Amino acid sequence: MIRFSQEKVLLLHQLIILETGGSPELRDINLLNSAIEGVYQTFGGQELYPTKEEKGARLGYTLISNHAFVDGNKRIGMYVMLTFLEVNGIRMDCTNEDVIFAGLSVASGSMNYEQLLTWVREHRAV
């Protein structure tokens, strides 16, 4: 499985901000690391997020909800989630509007992790 490093997420965030605008500043490195490393947590020797879909959804959810960046949290969360899934062999079938809706829903608190995971599963390409 291809993992995303702190450096990769920071670079992707910079590229997104350059392309779409906003502040490139990092608010809290610990919140960023928590989002990135949290998907690999274990308890009693068992992964808390064992599937690629679970890891991807958790990564997207925590990047958005942790607010590690001054700006662009929704954009980086959804982009990293979708890219993580794709590089790990999971193709998605969703429109830009679908992605925007999911990102805004997570940010507003109307979509939790389990609901984002369901969204990922429902938008997986067949």
Task: Give residue ranges: language-model regions.
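FIC/Doc superfamily catalytic core
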Residues: 1-126
